[in-house]
Amino acid sequence: NSIMKNLNLLILVLLSSVFFSTNCISQLTTIIDGANESNKAGPLYTWYEYGLYQTIYSQSEVGSASGISGLEWEWDGSHTTTKTIKIWLGHTTQTDFSSTSNYIPTTSMTLVYSGTITLSSGVSWTAVTFDNAFSYNGTDNLVIAVEDNTGSFTGSSTNRFKCFTLSSSADDRTLYQYS
């Protein structure tokens, strides 16, 4: 009887460790590394009341199939501000935006976060933990859409993120609009 209890306990511990280790490994936070890129207004431009920002990351930048449970962006701001945002992630075969109106519909993406984000004064990494993890397939490119619904401007035109250069070049992987 004692041997059976110990055996059952051992099986329970082994199954629990397999479950929890699989769960931990499958949930990743993707760091959006713009260290070699310009200081720009995306993914949020605190100088405006509303905004929509989309960027495409290639499969080679994102890597193999996994669950993505959050994002981090490098921020450089002159003061602390809070924004009301939504974040969508999606798969796409697009490699860039061919025109300034070539947005990928958020209806074809997964809403992963809806809430507020606080951006602290100074240079720092700003993390967002998703409400729902996104299952990245490891094959397609990844599109990230960030919508700012704050409704008032808070900030300075000098507040910036490290991100892909926003330009009109043929390989432009970032698209945005602010009002």
Task: Show which residues each predicted segment covers.
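Extracellular/lumenal carbohydrate-interaction signature centered on repeated Trp-anchored short motifs
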Residues: 62-67, 134-137
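Aromatic- and Gly/Pro-enriched, solvent-exposed loop/edge beta-strand patches characteristic
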Residues: 77, 83-168
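Short, conserved beta-strand segments within well-ordered enzyme catalytic domains
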Residues: 56, 72-74, 86-88
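PGST-rich, cysteine-poor low-complexity/disordered linker and tail segments that act as flexible spacers
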Residues: 169-179
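Boundary/junction segments of secreted and surface-exposed precursor proteins
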Residues: 21-50
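Bacterial Sec-dependent N-terminal signal peptides
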Residues: 1-30
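A short beta-strand element within beta-rich, extracytoplasmic domains
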Residues: 66-78, 144
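Short beta-strands within extracellular/lumenal beta-sheet-rich domains
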Residues: 48-63, 125-127
